[in-house]
């Protein structure tokens, strides 16, 4: 499966941020699906089996922390790597994301080249 055939699920409730990231990911050759909250993210993960999930942590309905923990407890999606996206840049926030089951962590505003490197690392590690 090529990178262009693998779906990246972007979970972001801010429409401006979501649209900007979708455009940039598509320009980088990725197929992108979106969800606007943690509950919708879990549903999309089960239905679409994305290669990687980019998950904002501050989401309505169900926050990213909770969605990550629940994904880890669901055998059908537990192996899907999740990269946490958050404005919280403290080391304890990174530790919290990893404890919740995230595979990696990126801060906002997003350093796009760094994010692409993190995505590539997860794709290589899991496929």
Annotate each language-model stretch with its function.
Residues 56, 86:
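Active-site residues of response regulator receiver
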């Amino acid at each position: 499966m090529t990178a262009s055939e693998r779906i990246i699920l972007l979970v972001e409730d801010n429409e401006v941020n979501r649209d900007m990231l979708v455009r940039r990911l598509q320009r980088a050759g990725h197929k992108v699906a979106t969800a606007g909250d943690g509950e919708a993210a879990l549903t999309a993960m089960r239905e679409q089996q994305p290669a990687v999930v980019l998950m904002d942590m501050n989401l309505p309905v169900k926050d990213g922390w909770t969605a990550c923990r629940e994904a880890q407890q669901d055998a059908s999606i537990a192996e899907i790597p999740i990269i946490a996206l958050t404005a919280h840049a403290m080391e304890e926030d990174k530790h919290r994301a990893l404890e919740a089951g995230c595979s990696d962590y990126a801060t906002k505003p997003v350093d796009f080249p760094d994010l692409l490197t993190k995505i590539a690392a997860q794709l290589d590690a899991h496929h």
